């Protein structure tokens, strides 16, 4: 069976490198980009199985990029990896075409499970409660 082909979009290289380490050798990273416009170009050119993207990026944000990819017929599944834990962001991302939403503090714990669920056609939304935010 061939490896899942992933395009990674985040404007913080340290975070992208961490995600790549979490994924390990079980996946093929076919591209890494650092802004939404580059995400559009790479996704249409490379047709990844899965796109892992941030919301807040320069040039074009991740939500608008994913919305545009859907309009252009890109079949790639999308999981957002973001600092935004607000439910409004989750709804907006799902409406734009995302199948997954992980808040960055939960990436190490949730990413591999999220990928399996999303590739199986299910929605995955990570939880991030007050205890994890240090608010409890």
Predicted regions mapped to residue ranges:
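Conserved sequence signature across two-component system core domains
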Residues: 9-10, 33, 51
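Short acidic/polar segment at the start of the alpha1 helix of CheY-like receiver
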Residues: 12-16, 89, 125
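Two-component/phosphorelay signaling modules centered on CheY-like receiver
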Residues: 13-31
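Acidic catalytic/metal-coordinating carboxylates
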Residues: 35-38, 61-64
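Active-site residues of response regulator receiver
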Residues: 54, 82
């Amino acid at each position: 069976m061939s490896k899942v082909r992933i395009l990674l979009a985040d404007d913080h290289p340290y975070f992208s490198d961490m995600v790549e380490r979490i994924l390990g050798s079980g996946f093929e990273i076919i591209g890494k980009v650092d802004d939404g416009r580059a995400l559009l170009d790479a996704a249409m050119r490379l047709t990844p199985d899965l796109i892992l993207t941030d919301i807040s990026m320069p040039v074009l944000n991740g939500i608008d990029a994913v919305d545009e990819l859907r309009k252009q017929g890109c079949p790639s599944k999308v999981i957002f990896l973001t600092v935004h834990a607000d439910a409004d962001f989750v709804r907006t991302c799902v409406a734009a075409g995302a199948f997954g939403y992980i808040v960055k503090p939960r990436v190490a714990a949730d990413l591999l499970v999220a990928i399996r669920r999303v590739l199986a056609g299910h929605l995955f939304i990570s939880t991030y409660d007050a205890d994890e935010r240090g608010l409890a």
